[in-house]
């Protein structure tokens, strides 16, 4: 494993560097005392360890912050898991966004036990520029047209941030100028908080993680076709249903409840996926937790997703984040907290490779990842597809959702409701159903 890390992970020189905070900003500095043994650790689970024991270990390892005095990443090779091993990787988000990190991790894998690299990394041969380490330059350089306009609007928000957020009517006045981007800015500025549930609150340091058994991707696609929805619609409606069932089991009210999720949107061209850095936007997706009818809930998720297509929210958020990066840290923290307080969860869906991969001679049976949270966001939802299967994972704050496995275990049941509904469809049917009739036909509300 250490050999693979040295040959394929550390080829990205940034991973030999640490972030050094200076007054008002931070810079990357090479760790002159770098030692791979500090970052690649070999441990073992006790006894006949399974999923529960590994979830407990991941929850424990994920809590303490990475050492800022060293490059902020770590590999834990865990022996004695289900007769094999597991690899737990922690990488600070300052190095790269999810799309770039997935590309980095896949560059370490092989297409067979003794096969060639599955996704070889061939960095462009050019002389490094002085501004290569500038996060702002990395964000601005590929932008043109609407992206640059988003940066300008983001800069406006940074300059006039307090006025706009404290007096939303000023944001509305901006929208009346006719710009689609400023209209989106008005929506963000006037957006209220989502429903107060046990998924929302100030997170503490202790976390809990859980993941579901994988679903066949072809089956998810078939259900989506039968019901007139996308794979994402199906999966997100199951997430909403599982969260609803969990709240109901806890005795919490669910009527009219909406949980809003921040969804990162990749804005990086695929040909530049090898580059590190963060280049993503954000959209706010509303999950209709208050809907009991699974078919109605599916169509509500679908409509919410459709309303975001073509939205300027992602590029506007990128502009805001990039402009924030050039502003004082106090303003960065304030605006980030404002964005975060309007949501209860971060939700990421990553399309993984659909063929088996090997790492250091061992076949990879499954992949899972978790996303960081900030502000009042206490839940991270992760969906990843790999080798013909799709996996659902959850990370929660121990203080207000100490048992994410109780949410996870309800995910499969919500999917089965949609399977039953699809099976009741006439042969060859594809498209919308009447939610009430469909629900009654399969015996669900």
Feature roles, as predicted:
Residues 3-377, 381-444:
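Soluble acyl-CoA-dependent acyltransferase catalytic core bearing the H(X)4D motif
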């Amino acid at each position: 494993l250490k050999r693979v890390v040295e040959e394929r992970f550390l080829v990205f020189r940034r991973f030999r560097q640490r972030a050094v905070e200076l007054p008002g900003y931070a810079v990357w500095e090479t760790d002159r005392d770098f030692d791979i043994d500090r970052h690649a650790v070999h441990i073992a689970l006790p006894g006949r360890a399974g999923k529960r024991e590994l979830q407990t270990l991941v929850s424990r390892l994920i809590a303490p912050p990475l050492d800022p005095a060293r490059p902020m990443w770590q590999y834990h090779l865990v022996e004695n898991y289900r007769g094999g091993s597991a690899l737990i990787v922690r990488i600070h988000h300052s190095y790269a966004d999810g799309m770039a990190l997935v590309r980095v991790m896949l560059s370490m894998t092989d297409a067979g036990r003794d096969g060639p690299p599955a996704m070889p990394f061939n960095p462009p041969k050019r002389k490094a520029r002085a501004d290569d380490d500038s996060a702002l330059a990395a964000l601005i350089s590929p932008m043109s047209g609407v992206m640059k306009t988003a940066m300008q609007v983001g800069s406006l928000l940074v300059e006039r941030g307090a006025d706009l957020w404290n007096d939303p009517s000023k944001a509305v006045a901006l929208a009346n100028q006719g710009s689609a981007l400023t209209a989106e800015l008005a929506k963000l500025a006037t957006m209220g908080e989502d429903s107060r549930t046990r998924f929302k609150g100030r997170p503490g340091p202790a976390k809990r993680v859980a993941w579901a058994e994988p679903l066949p991707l072809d089956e998810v696609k078939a259900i989506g076709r039968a019901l007139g929805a996308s794979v994402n619609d199906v999966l997100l409606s199951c997430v909403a249903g599982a969260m609803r069932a969990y709240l109901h089991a806890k005795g919490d009210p669910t009527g009219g409840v909406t949980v809003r999720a921040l969804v990162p949107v990749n804005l990086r061209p695929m040909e530049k996926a090898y580059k590190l850095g963060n280049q993503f936007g954000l959209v706010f997706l509303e999950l209709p937790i208050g809907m009991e009818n699974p078919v109605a809930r599916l169509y509500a998720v679908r409509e919410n997703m459709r309303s975001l297509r073509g939205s300027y929210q992602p590029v506007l958020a990128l502009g805001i984040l990039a402009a924030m990066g050039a502003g004082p840290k106090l303003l960065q923290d304030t605006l980030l907290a404002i964005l975060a307080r309007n949501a209860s969860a971060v939700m990421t869906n990553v399309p993984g490779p659909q063929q088996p991969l090997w790492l250091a001679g061992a076949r990879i049976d499954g992949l899972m990842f978790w996303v960081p949270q900030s502000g009042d966001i206490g839940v991270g939802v992760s969906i990843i597809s790999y080798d013909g299967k799709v996996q659902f994972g959850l990370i929660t704050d121990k203080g207000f959702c100490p048992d994410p496995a109780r949410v996870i275990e309800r995910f499969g049941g919500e999917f089965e409701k949609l399977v039953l509904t699809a099976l009741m469809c006439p042969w060859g049917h594809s498209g919308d159903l009447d939610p009430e009739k469909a629900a009654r036909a399969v015996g669900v509300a």
